[in-house]
C-alpha cells in the first residue's frame, strides 16, 4: 500500500489521540491509587465518578424525572479498612446518589469484601490500586491488579444493563472524598479503553493529591479534560505553470471531510463508508483541479470523527471501538501539469500538523455530536494557506496496537454512490410540549441532519 500511495502514512493526532468526552463514555476502565494515612489512623477514603451526568440534571433528558443540582449526583467508591480492627475483611463500599428520586442522599448499593490476601493489617496503609471496569452499567471491581474481579455490580438505576437500555453511569466528572479527621492520598487516576488494548485515554491526577478532611470532611469534584475530534492540515507550494488536473485519493479510520484552500472538497457524508475494515478498506477519488492555485502556497486539511471505526457502532458493549480507538487519515494528492510533470503530496506526519482543540468536542454515530461554537473563531480559515498554525502540533503516524486490524487488508476504490443530501424539508408544524421542549413535524420519516438557527444566545449557553 505504501508503495502504491507514494509512502503515504496513516496520520492523526500526536497527543490526546483518543477522542474523549466524559459525559458520553459508558464503556471504560478506570484506575486510581489510594493511600490511607497511618498517622491519623484513617480508615476510609472514597473516589467519585459518574458525577454531573447532564442527563440527570435536566428532567427532559431522562426517563426518571430527575433534575439534579450540580455535584448532587455521582457514584462513590469507598475503601473501608475499619473492619480489619475486628478481624474482619476490609470493604469496598459502593454508594450512589442522585440517580433515582429516592437517592437525594448517598445510598449504599453494595459492600464488597476484600480478601485478606489483598488488603490486611500488614499492608492496610500501603498504596492500593482500585480498578473499575464498566460495561454499559455492569461494573467490575478489582484491587491491586488482581485479575479476578471482587464483584460485579449493576449500577444502572433502572436495574437493567447492556446495550438494549440507556446506559448509566458514564465516566462523568470525577473527584475525591474524606470524612472529618481523615486523610488520604490519591494519585494515578487514569481512564483507559475497556477493550483488550487498555490504551490510556486520559489521566486525571498523575501527581499525588493529599486530602485532609479537617473538622467537616472534604469532597471535591472536577471535570476531566476532553480530547476533541482530530483536525489535520498541511501546506505545499505548486510550480509556476499551468495545471492540467489535480486529484485527491483518500480514506480514513473513522469518517472524514477534506478541505483545500478554504473550500470543502465534497458534499458527501460519512466517507469512506462502512466495510469490514480489517478485510477491505475503500478510498474515494476527488477532482480538486478548481481548488489548486498555481505558482503559490496551497493548503489542504481534514476533519475526522469516529464513524464506524471506533466508539459505539452496535448495541453490544464489547463491540465498542471494534476496529480501533484512534482516527487516522490516509491520502495523497496528485497534481499533473500541462507539460506532463507531476507533483505528489501525501499524508506524511513530518509535514502535517494536528489540532487538539476543535469545536467538535465529540463526534459519534451512537453518542451524537458535541459542538462548542466558542472555539470556532480560533480555527476560522484553518484550511487556507495563510492561516497561522503555530499553535498546532506535529501529526503522528497512527498504528492500532491491540486490535485485530493490521496491514493485512485490501485497499480498493469505492464503487458505491456517495451519501448526499437530496432534499431540504421545512417543518410543517411545531409544538412546545413542555417549557423549552419543542417537537417539529416534518411530515415524513427521514434520514437526515437537522438545521437549526439560534439567535441572541450568550457564550456558554447549552
Labelled PLM ranges:
Residues 1-224:
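Extracellular glycan-recognition regions
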Residues 18-25, 118-120, 162-164, 281-291, ...:
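Beta-sandwich interaction modules
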Residues 7, 27, 173, 187-188, ...:
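Extracellular/lumenal ectodomain signal focusing on beta-strand-rich modules
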Residues 25-29, 239-247, 435, 445-450, ...:
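Extended extracellular/luminal ectodomain segments enriched in beta-structured repeat modules
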Residues 15-16, 226-239, 282-287, 433-444:
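Short beta-strands within extracellular/lumenal beta-sheet-rich domains
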Residues 1-2, 46-47, 54, 168-169, ...:
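An acidic-aromatic loop/edge-strand motif
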Residues 328, 423-437, 444:
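Surface beta-strand/loop "capping" patches
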Residues 135-138, 147-163, 180-182, 232-378, ...:
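Accessory beta-strand-rich segments of carbohydrate-active enzymes
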Amino acid at each position: 500500500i505504501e508503495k502504491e500511495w507514494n509512502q503515504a502514512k496513516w496520520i492523526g493526532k500526536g497527543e490526546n489521540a483518543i477522542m474523549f468526552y466524559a459525559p458520553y463514555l459508558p464503556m471504560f476502565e478506570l484506575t486510581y491509587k489510594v493511600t490511607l494515612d497511618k498517622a491519623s489512623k484513617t480508615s476510609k477514603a472514597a473516589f467519585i465518578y459518574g458525577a454531573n451526568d447532564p442527563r440527570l440534571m435536566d428532567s427532559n433528558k431522562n426517563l426518571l424525572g430527575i433534575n439534579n443540582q450540580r455535584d448532587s449526583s455521582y457514584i462513590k467508591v469507598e475503601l473501608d479498612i475499619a473492619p480489619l480492627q475486628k478481624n474482619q475483611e476490609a470493604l469496598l463500599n459502593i454508594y450512589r446518589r442522585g440517580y433515582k428520586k429516592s437517592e437525594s442522599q448517598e445510598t449504599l448499593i453494595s459492600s464488597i469484601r476484600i480478601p485478606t490476601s489483598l488488603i490486611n493489617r500488614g499492608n492496610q496503609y500501603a498504596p492500593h490500586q482500585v480498578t473499575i471496569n464498566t460495561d454499559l452499567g455492569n461494573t467490575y471491581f478489582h484491587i491491586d491488579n488482581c485479575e479476578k474481579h471482587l464483584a460485579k455490580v449493576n449500577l444502572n438505576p433502572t436495574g437493567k444493563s447492556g446495550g438494549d437500555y440507556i446506559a448509566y453511569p458514564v465516566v462523568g466528572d470525577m473527584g475525591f472524598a474524606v470524612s472529618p479527621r481523615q486523610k488520604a492520598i490519591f494519585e494515578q487516576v487514569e481512564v483507559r479503553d475497556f477493550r483488550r488494548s487498555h490504551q490510556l485515554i486520559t489521566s486525571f491526577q498523575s501527581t499525588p493529591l493529599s486530602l485532609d478532611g479537617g473538622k467537616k470532611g472534604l469532597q471535591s469534584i472536577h471535570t476531566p479534560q476532553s480530547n476533541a475530534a482530530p483536525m489535520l492540515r498541511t501546506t505545499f507550494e505548486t510550480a509556476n505553470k499551468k495545471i492540467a488536473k489535480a486529484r485527491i485519493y483518500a480514506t480514513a479510520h473513522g469518517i472524514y471531510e477534506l478541505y483545500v484552500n478554504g473550500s470543502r472538497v465534497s458534499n458527501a457524508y460519512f466517507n469512506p463508508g462502512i466495510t469490514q475494515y480489517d478485510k477491505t478498506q475503500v478510498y474515494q477519488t476527488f477532482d480538486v483541479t478548481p481548488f489548486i492555485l498555481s505558482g503559490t502556497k496551497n493548503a489542504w486539511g481534514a476533519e475526522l470523527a469516529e464513524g464506524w471505526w471506533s466508539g459505539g457502532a452496535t448495541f453490544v458493549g464489547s463491540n465498542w471501538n471494534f476496529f480501533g480507538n484512534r482516527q487516522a487519515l490516509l491520502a495523497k494528492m496528485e497534481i499533473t501539469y500541462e507539460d506532463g510533470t507531476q507533483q505528489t503530496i501525501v499524508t506524511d506526519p513530518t509535514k502535517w500538523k494536528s489540532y487538539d482543540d476543535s469545536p467538535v468536542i465529540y463526534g459519534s454515530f451512537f453518542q451524537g455530536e458535541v459542538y462548542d461554537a466558542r472555539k470556532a473563531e480560533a480555527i476560522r480559515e484553518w484550511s487556507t494557506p495563510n492561516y497561522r498554525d503555530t499553535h498546532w502540533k506535529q501529526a503522528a503516524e497512527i498504528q492500532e496496537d491491540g486490535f485485530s486490524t493490521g496491514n493485512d487488508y485490501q485497499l480498493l476504490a469505492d464503487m458505491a454512490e456517495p451519501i448526499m443530501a437530496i432534499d431540504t424539508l421545512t417543518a410543517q408544524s411545531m409544538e412546545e410540549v413542555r417549557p423549552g421542549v419543542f417537537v417539529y413535524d416534518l411530515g415524513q420519516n427521514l434520514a437526515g441532519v437537522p438545521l437549526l438557527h439560534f439567535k441572541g444566545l450568550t457564550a456558554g449557553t447549552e
